[in-house]
Every structure is written in structure tokens, then in C-alpha cells.
């Protein structure tokens, strides 16, 4: 079970790497993906600062370095950054590639991420759902903006 939890913990990073690999030869989508991934992260931090909803009490750590990372803005759990980043990647990659095989793999990794964050008491179900929805919206908006304003490949 530890390997599944570890995959869940690193799910957003795994999905980011998958996106970079898949989009490497499609420059406008590659650069857009990386740029908007950063914007998605910034949106998450701004929402956490604005909403200020704390994480659940007594969250468990999967990695030793986790003990000190839930301070400052990271003490807040709304919306879940893991869920938001995962669903940003899923949405962006699906809209660009429309490949059901990639979608299934990405959804599997994102499901492990959602499960890990919930089972380790790092987020409530509401924080995970809102994070997922924000990620979908940012992913969709990113591809829409790129398709509208960046016409060269």
C-alpha cells in the first residue's frame, strides 16, 4: 500500500512529467502547458490565502520532509493543490491529445492522489472536490486561450 500512497503523493509531479513528455514536440502546447501550470499553482496559493480554510487536524505524513511543509499558506487546505494540479494536467492533456489511453492512465494517477490526500487526512472531501474543479476550469481556460491567441505551431 505504501507504493500506491507514494504514487498518490507524487501524482501531480508524475502528471507534469507525462505532460512534458507528451507535448514536447508541440511547442505552443508545451510552452502553454508549462506556463499555465505555474499560473494554476499561483491561483491555488491565492485561493488558499483568500479562503483560509484549515486542513483537517492530525494529518499523517507519507514522507519525512512533509513535517515542515504545512506552514504559512500551506497550513490551509482549500482548495487542494494536489487535486487542482492533477486535474489541470488531465484536462489540458485530454483537450490537446484527445487520447483515451492517456486519459485512463492520468485518471488512475489522479485517483490515487485524491485517495492519498483524503486517507492521510490532509484534505477534506470538499477541499479535494473544489481543487479538482478549479483544476478542470484552469486546464480548459488554458487550452482555450492558447487556441485563440497562439496560432503558430
What do the predicted segments below correspond to?
Residues 98, 105-106, 144, 149-151:
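Short, charged/polar low-complexity linear motifs in solvent-exposed/disordered segments
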Residues 82-86, 123-147:
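Alpha-helical transmembrane segments that form the membrane-embedded catalytic/substrate-binding core
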Residues 25-29, 69, 133, 147, ...:
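Charge-rich, low-complexity amphipathic helices
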Residues 50-55, 59, 124, 145-153:
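Membrane-interfacial segments
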Residues 1-78, 84-119:
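Hydrophobic alpha-helical bundle signature of multipass membrane enzymes
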Amino acid at each position: 500500500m505504501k507504493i500506491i500512497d507514494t504514487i498518490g503523493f507524487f501524482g501531480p509531479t508524475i502528471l507534469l512529467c507525462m505532460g512534458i513528455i507528451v507535448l514536447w514536440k508541440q511547442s505552443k502546447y508545451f510552452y502553454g502547458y508549462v506556463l499555465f501550470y505555474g499560473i494554476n499553482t499561483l491561483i491555488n496559493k491565492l485561493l488558499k490565502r483568500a479562503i483560509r480554510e484549515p486542513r483537517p487536524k492530525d494529518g499523517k505524513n507519507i514522507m519525512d520532509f512533509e513535517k515542515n511543509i504545512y506552514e504559512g499558506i500551506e497550513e490551509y487546505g482549500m482548495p487542494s493543490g494536489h487535486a487542482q494540479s492533477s486535474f489541470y494536467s488531465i484536462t489540458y492533456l485530454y483537450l490537446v491529445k484527445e487520447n483515451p489511453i492517456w486519459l485512463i492512465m492520468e485518471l488512475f494517477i489522479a485517483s490515487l492522489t485524491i485517495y492519498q490526500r483524503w486517507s492521510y487526512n490532509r484534505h477534506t472531501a470538499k477541499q479535494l472536490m473544489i481543487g479538482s474543479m478549479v483544476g478542470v476550469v484552469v486546464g480548459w481556460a488554458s487550452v482555450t486561450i492558447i487556441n485563440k491567441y497562439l496560432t503558430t505551431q
